[in-house]
């Protein structure tokens, strides 16, 4: 069967990142778009031609939107085998039109239940029913239907359609279908875990856990040349996860054990800024040595690099936007081990591939949120939930007399996202959405603070007007006083010390704004 022409698309997304531009391009390619609820409104408000799904079903959305796409005219249009004469005849007989593309991402169940204090009712309302059903139908019929769940895939699908007269390749449809079943498996697993926890059970205390490991990548050696190593796909109760599911290596030497650790660190941190302003993350030995957000990617790169102008050499750089030529030329001036981006703009790969050993990776989809983390010891296996809980602005507890300004709040939230990705003890200085000083991995929190200040002074970054984040509480006021002396105006920390009052008094005495998150972020 030849690649089918995409004539009709069904679009219904919770995360609307890039959806308007994507659908505008689809429309220009002659694709008829049908949509639901908030997505339909967003498209129509932006001048994109789109029609209600009710025109297909002949039935309105009902029960507060719980029922809108669960209809034979939707699933028949997705599941019909196009070269099966009986299917085609039944579709004609029942007035069912084929649907060639599905663009759906799911209600944010994992993000909802990750928020402290979420109600059971809110969690239940964020269980998507119609979305997974459409995704599974479309993915099952991937020979004929293109299905997208991640905005990172929009550019490559559009590029294929432009170059092939409105079609996608079989390989792309199959890759996207695999992503669907990985997504729905994780999604259902998250719901099952939440409902188990809602009954008061402790999932991590399960008496047995079954895990399957299959070698995916050979490696020359481990952390050091005398250690053998390999990379394995992991199958557990949440489904199967593999490197190839999330990344594609476009260029460079084979990946090493240490590379894989750094890729995990870089992609995990840049994931915090998915859908936000252009962001750049620089990693060395799994620790961030520079992170920044800015109106342009190249500006974010320069700001991140300015945090520490030595550590990025031989480091790993991750971008939350397609890597453009201006940024690529700037990055190309230093030696880097790995670059990770959702895509590379025209001509960028030609430039970067001139350095034959540098690895260039595409991150194909968002990393899974939540789930289990496994760490081996010589005497057994540790299992814990990933540190993926989210602190929102409304969760912050202002404990000082002075409230943080809006600008300070923005920097505090930015710092907190980064803080949990740094080895403990962590002290992090941030100003204007860019790191100014990173103190990582010290046995004493005061030493981490000293290192962060010293690193800032080494590159002539003025800490006056900055904010500071600490991954755990200040056990004494001395750490906070050192930050105040450096010029900090606001502080974010978990709180919970028996000397919290002493620390709060010190903050008030220095006119600092301080917020408690109620959540510690130790990282060993």
UniProtKB/Swiss-Prot annotation:
Signal peptide: none annotated. Pfam families: AICARFT_IMPCHas, MGS. It comes from the Bacteria. InterPro entries: AICAR_Tfase_dup_dom_sf, Cytidine_deaminase-like, MGS-like_dom, MGS-like_dom_sf, PurH-like. It catalyses: (6R)-10-formyltetrahydrofolate + 5-amino-1-(5-phospho-beta-D-ribosyl)imidazole-4-carboxamide = 5-formamido-1-(5-phospho-D-ribosyl)imidazole-4-carboxamide + (6S)-5,6,7,8-tetrahydrofolate; IMP + H2O = 5-formamido-1-(5-phospho-D-ribosyl)imidazole-4-carboxamide. The keyword Transferase applies. Its EC number is 2.1.2.3, 3.5.4.10. PANTHER family: BIFUNCTIONAL PURINE BIOSYNTHESIS PROTEIN ATIC, BIFUNCTIONAL PURINE BIOSYNTHESIS PROTEIN PURH. This is Bifunctional purine biosynthesis protein PurH.
